[in-house]
C-alpha cells in the first residue's frame, strides 16, 4: 500500500490566507487534491497541519482524510514530512508514501496511477514526475528511505535524500505542467486559477 501525504502546515505568509482553503472551480485546493487522490489506488490519505490548526481542522473535517499535527511546522516542510513518516512507520503494509504539497492543486489521477504502477514494477526508491526539464509533485518515497528522511538535515529538506539516491530515482515524463505549478502568491493565484 502507498499512503498519500498532503503537506499543509505552513503559514501561507506570501498568500496572506491558508492555501489549502483557496477556491478553485467551486472547491478548495485541498478538496480538489483529496478528490483526485481518492480516484487512485493510494491507501490512507494523511494531511499534516501546523499553522492555525484548530481552524484548519474545522474547515477540512468533512474530508475522508486522517489529520496529523506538526507542532514544529516553523522548522519547514521536512519537519511535517517526518510527522507523517513516524505515523506511517507503524503501519506494516505501507510500502511507500506519495508526498504532495497543498499549493499544487493540479494533480492528475492518471499520473498518480502511472507513478504507483512504476514504483512496484521497477523497485526504484523514488518516483518523480518531470515536465520538460523540471521535476514536480507528487513524489513517491519508498519505505526504505523513511530512516534517511527522519535523519536528514532540516535546512536541506528531502532534497538531500533525493540527491543521495540519483541511481534509485525514476523520472516519469508528463505533458502536465500542473506538476510544477506552485501557487503561493496572490499574483500566481490570479494567473493560474482565476483565469481558468
Across the structure, where does each feature detected by a protein language model lie?
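Conserved N-terminal catalytic core of the sugar/cofactor nucleotidyltransferase
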Residues: 32-96
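Short aromatic/basic micro-patch
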Residues: 23, 106, 139-140, 171, ...
